[in-house]
Amino acid sequence: TPNEQGVFTEDNTARFSSAVWYENIRSKTIILAGVGGIGSWTALLLGKLQPLSMFIYDNDAVEQVNMAGQLNSTNNIGKSKVDALSNTIKKYAAYNSVFAVNGRYDMSCEASDIMICGFDNMRARAMFFDKWKHHVALKPDDERSHCLFIDGRLAAEELQVFCITGDNEFAIRNYESNYL
């Protein structure tokens, strides 16, 4: 539909279609591993941005205990988290380029420029970060700034979010040394 200026926009992304970063995100593949308390909500919001594609990884099934902080409904209990979340994203974000991988993300999995970590254990975080770091190392120097690693950590009363670009060697070393 045309907006006030007569420019056609997609209704479901019109709110942020004029943002300077918007066209960039639409050309990106995003990998999000761990779709619990942080990952499930993040995936929904990313779906609303309509990236080129989004791969979500998790090997857990939805349980009653997940109702407290995760994006789930009681209708999803017993289903795989990624299948339930994928269906939710398709329904509430009108986004169909989300790919559910019902399994653990491991070193044999593909990496992408944008990787978001929603794991709840340090070993998985370290492996996921190593995979991203290796991917970035293969990029030409001028493309590394377009690579992004995000690690969200959630405790009962504390939230930490680490955002690292591929060209920030200090942040990469600091994260490895002090936060993994």
Language model feature labels by segment:
Residues 1-31:
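N-terminal charged helix/coil linker that caps or initiates catalytic domains
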Residues 24-27, 48, 108-111, 142-144:
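Flexible, charged surface loops at secondary-structure boundaries
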Residues 26-51, 55-63:
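Glycine-rich adenosine-cofactor-binding loop
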Residues 33-34, 57, 101-103, 117-120, ...:
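Short His-Asn-centered micro-motif
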Residues 53, 97-99, 148:
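Conserved beta-strand segments of alpha/beta enzyme cores
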Residues 53-94:
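Glycine-rich phosphate-binding loop and adjoining beta1-alpha1-beta2 segment
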Residues 80-112, 119-123:
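A structured beta-alpha segment of the ubiquitous adenosine-cofactor-binding alpha/beta core
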Residues 111-180:
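E1/E1-like adenylate-forming module used to activate ubiquitin-like modifiers
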